[in-house]
Amino acid sequence: MMTTDTIQNISKSPVTGKEYEIPVIQDDKAGIDAFIALHPGKKVVVVQGLGFVGSVMGLVVANALTEEYAVIGIDLPTTASYWKIRSINEGIFPVIASDPKIDQYYQNALKKKNYYATYDAHVYSKADVVVVDINLDVKKKSSDKQDPEGYSVDLSPFKKAIEAIGINCKEDVLVLVETTVPPGTSKKIVRPILEECLTKRGLPADKIKVGHSYERVMPGPKYIDSIQNFYRVFAGTDEKSTEAVETFLRTVIRTDEYPLTRLGNTNATEMAKVLENSFRAMNIAFMVEWSRFAEEAGVDIYEVVNAIRMRPTHKNIMLPGLGVGGYCLTKDPLLASWARMNLFGSEERLGQSEKGVHINDKMPLYAFEFLQSQYKEALAGKKVLLLGVSYLNDVGDTRYTPVEGFYDQLEIEGCEIVLHDPHVKYWEEKDVWVNQDLDELLKDSYNIIAITTGHKDYRNNESLINKLIDQPVSFLYDTIGVLTNEEIKRLSAKHIVKVIGRGDL
């Protein structure tokens, strides 16, 4: 359905390794119109952005509970994204996940032929609903995270994406923002852009509907459920927008079991998302300090935390780790602080929230320095096996993974680094392939073996422990707290074993 006249670049799928030629002339009108013709009478839902959230949100909408939709995902024809478009249209879902519902829902969509992908903004002219699931990034001034005190928020790409909707959309379309945005964005940025575009086109600007309902997507074994079977907060920029958002969400979310929560306005829903994530980021930063204290005091911080968790009011106290990763916790407190000053005119930052991000950003560097202090040999030329590259256990998401900072420091020191992750084949940010055969890797020997992600494959795994024991004398470094006391005892009989937060070892 897509035409290619002149070849500009290549987009390579990390899922299959297949390469796709990116067309310079971006015209997919015929493909879009042919798809819509297959679904007469159905409302068209366009999902803007085919990343970890948007691609799966498209699946959920294609498998809506109470209405049949024609779903079209749109992304940019870039080297990073074009392969996703082609993959969806060729019957290969672009996200690898441990959730069996992903494949089930995708197979259902293939049978119904109700999920298409494109790069052509013409698609917005067909949309009854546009769900915005694109990135809105924070740029930290220090790329190596050793001095992350400065940051900037550039809304230009986000604004351009909203303009693309406004230039093409129907006058009464519902634009539902799921992207995590600075509080104030829907009212102060999204709606004004859409209204201006409609006015320039000679269309009324008062029929457009704009709402915000943030996603709580958790890649992993409950990927689909984190969208369809989970609580949602929502609001609109006016009453008709709010009603339209609620009506749409009720068709895709199991609201009988997970009731919707309506807030007073979109400023409130946008604040709810960044506050929710800032709370978690602050908890993690808090524990970073205490884990260091425990190491200095000869204390097992895990033992301490588990004792405190017996108190019902303290069950959510965090455990230490390599650091914070993923797309949300690494930036959301900064979005909130930026909004306070730039959209609402305050002279004050959200100082504590910003500090929490800075502490978390430095954690991979601290983990590396802890390794240096405990290993007591030069790292240059040492062979290091990293167990896990994703930012979270049992998922294949490497965005802003704290493993990257740790990896970079090892690379700077001249280490030979070998990677394993059961959920990641290709580490896009580092442009390296990842081995998924741990048994094969452990046939070789290593100077250092570090557990850097808490995958279940590394937990309570008797076979893994035996293979580690069979290794020549090594330095085993658990940055997550995966190893049990019994496993540490067995491993310590042969190897040096160190765990972040375990000052008793």
Where are these regions (language model features)?
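Structural/interface elements that position substrates and couple domains in central-metabolism enzymes
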Residues: M2-L505
